[in-house]
Amino acid sequence: SYFGLVPAALLGVDVKTLLDRAVTAAGYCRSCTPPGPGVVTGAWLGAILGKLAKAGRDKATFVLSPAIASFGDWVEQLIAESTGKQGTGIFPVVGEPVGDPDVYGDDRLFIYLRLDGDDTYDGAVQALQDAGQPVVRLHLEDIYDLGEQFFLWEMTIAVAGYRLGINPFDQPNVEAAKILARAMVSEYQEKGRLPANEAAPLASEALARFLDQAETDDYITLQAYVQPTPETDRALLSLRTRLRDRLKLATSVGYGPRFLHSTGQSHKGDAGNGLFIQLTSDATQDIPIPDEAGTTSSSITFGVLKAAQALGDRRALEDAGRRVIHFDLEQNVVTGLQRLAEGLA
């Protein structure tokens, strides 16, 4: 759409080449079976994802060449919103460091998107395949092959949704958190305070007790309603890696409220095998939101809105029977994350 193409063109992207690659993929996808060596069709790949998900390998784990790593954010939203509903779904795992074969269970399907000439993950992916993990390899000649990948994955997930018996084009659970968040904002405007979002003690022992509920084939999501910074990125990456290595469960990280529009649908609509760790912090700088455009009067701030969204999503998860724990990291986010990770070494 123009929404994405216009900024891309302004950044110097050769939009015609990008779209030409998408047209090529559309031509390939007219066939149910790959028309030649090295060619993947949406029907073929979608059938694989759907079949393996129904067999228990429902954690689609992406390994991406570093130059195309941001593609993971797009495909994560596509898969989670399209398939995570009616008690089923495919859980997308992006940004998780590639580990040794022994840190994975039998619920994974690895998808390796390799940019031509980049062998960064060749050895690690081959080790996973040698250990018996299923691996799908997708080769990109250059970054413009992302145009092909966009079309391929849209068709892939439509087919996978059909195999799972769900409609991949609706999002029935997204509105639940929004409704509750609006109710929290209304209460704040009436009473001057939000309902309490009770937090667990900020200690690794509290996290360990929560994780005692974990079962084989579960997954863990870190819901970080905090300011994104490089230091926070590293602390979250360390925590998720320790969780994965200790429990052998798939992990994901989402900054809130962004993730509500990417993986939020799946969190409430899938089979209920997620453990959700909600992380909040105090706003170091807050900005008032005008009640009406062109006015200076304000009854809430962005900090209040974010807190309401976090509380609304927690209530929506609990209403759906999900397992949730909340930690308030206050103002020192990185130190708080490190404290939680201490007991997971």
Where are these regions (language model features)?
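Conserved, well-ordered active-site substructure
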Residues: 259-296
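Phosphate/diphosphate-binding loops
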Residues: 112-139
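General beta-strand structural signal in soluble alpha/beta enzymes
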Residues: 17-20, 137, 251-255, 326
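C-terminal amphipathic alpha-helical interaction region
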Residues: 170, 175, 190, 209-222, ...
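Ligand-binding clefts of soluble mixed alpha/beta catalytic domains
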Residues: 143, 158, 164-167, 281-296, ...
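A structural-propensity feature for long, helix-poor, extended segments
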Residues: 111-114, 289-318
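Active-site phosphate/pyrophosphate-binding segments
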Residues: 1-109, 116-119, 142-148, 152-250, ...
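Hydrophobic/aromatic beta-strand patches that form the interior of the parallel beta-sheet core
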Residues: 91-93, 109-113, 136-139, 275-277, ...
